[in-house]
C-alpha cells in the first residue's frame, strides 16, 4: 500500500499536537523501524505514548489518503492460486494494519506487526516468527521490501530479498541482486 501521504498527514497532526520540531522528511528517513525507535532516532525524549496515540489517530482520520499500488489484488490472487503463503511484516501497529488491509480487502496467511514483546526491524526475530507460523523454511522464503531496514531484516534472517523499486526506499546497495519495478512482477 502507498501510505506516504497518510504518514505525512499523521506526522503533521502529531507534530502540531505535541509541539515537535522534527520535519516529516526527518521522520520519513527512519520509516520501517518501530515507531518508538523512530522517535528515539529523532531525539524525542518524552511523551512517547501520547505521541504514538496521536500519530495513530491522525493516520486513521486520514485513511482515505492511502492508495493501493496497481494490480495488487490481482497479483495476490495469482500468488495464492500458485499456493504461495503470503505474510505482511510491518512496523505499523496491528490495529491500523488491519484497518488498512480491510479497506483494500487484502488477506494474508499471517500478519506480523510491530510489538513491544519482540524485536522489530532490522532484527530477524519477527521474520523467524513468520516462518515458524507458516511452517516455511528459509530456503523457501523471500522478503519483498522497499526500505533499507527491510533489506537488513531479510539479511539478518538469512532469507532472500527482493527490492521493490516502486516503493519508498530508492536503495542503491550493491548487495541487492534482485528487484522488481512493479508489484505484478511477483506473480
Question: Language-model features: where?
Answer:
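N-terminal helical cap/lid subdomain that shapes the substrate entry/recognition surface
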Residues: 1-73, 82
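Active-site phosphate/pyrophosphate-handling residues
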Residues: 5-6, 37, 74, 95, ...
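Residue-level detector of anion-binding/catalytic polar loops
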Residues: 21, 85, 160
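A generic structural signal for short
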Residues: 24, 63-64, 85-86, 115-116, ...
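Structural motif
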Residues: 30, 89-91, 144
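Short, acidic loop-to-helix structural element flanking the phosphoryl-transfer center
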Residues: 60-88, 94-102, 124
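Asp-based, Mg2+/Mn2+-dependent phosphohydrolase catalytic module
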Residues: 80, 94, 98-187
Amino acid at each position: 500500500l502507498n501510505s506516504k501521504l497518510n504518514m505525512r498527514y499523521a506526522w503533521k497532526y502529531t507534530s502540531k499536537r505535541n509541539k515537535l520540531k522534527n520535519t516529516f522528511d526527518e521522520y520519513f528517513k527512519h520509516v520501517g523501524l518501530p515507531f518508538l525507535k523512530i522517535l528515539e532516532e529523532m531525539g524525542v525524549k518524552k511523551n512517547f505514548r501520547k505521541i504514538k496515540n496521536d500519530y495513530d489517530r491522525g493516520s486513521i482520520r486520514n485513511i482515505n489518503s492511502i492508495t493501493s499500488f496497481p494490480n495488487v489484488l490481482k497479483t495476490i490472487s495469482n500468488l495464492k492460486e500458485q499456493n504461495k503463503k503470503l505474510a505482511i511484516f510491518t512496523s505499523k501497529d496491528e490495529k491500523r494494519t488491519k484497518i488498512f488491509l480491510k479497506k483494500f480487502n487484502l488477506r494474508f496467511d499471517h500478519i506480523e506487526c510491530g510489538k513491544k514483546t519482540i524485536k522489530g526491524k532490522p532484527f530477524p526475530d519477527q521474520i523467524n516468527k513468520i516462518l515458524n507460523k507458516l511452517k516455511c523454511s528459509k530456503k523457501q522464503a523471500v522478503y519483498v521490501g522497499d526500505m533499507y531496514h527491510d533489506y537488513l531484516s531479510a539479511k539478518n534472517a538469512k532469507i532472500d530479498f527482493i527490492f521493490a523499486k516502486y516503493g519508498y526506499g530508492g536503495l542503491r546497495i550493491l548487495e541487492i541482486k534482485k528487484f522488481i519495478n512493479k508489484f505484478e512482477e511477483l506473480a
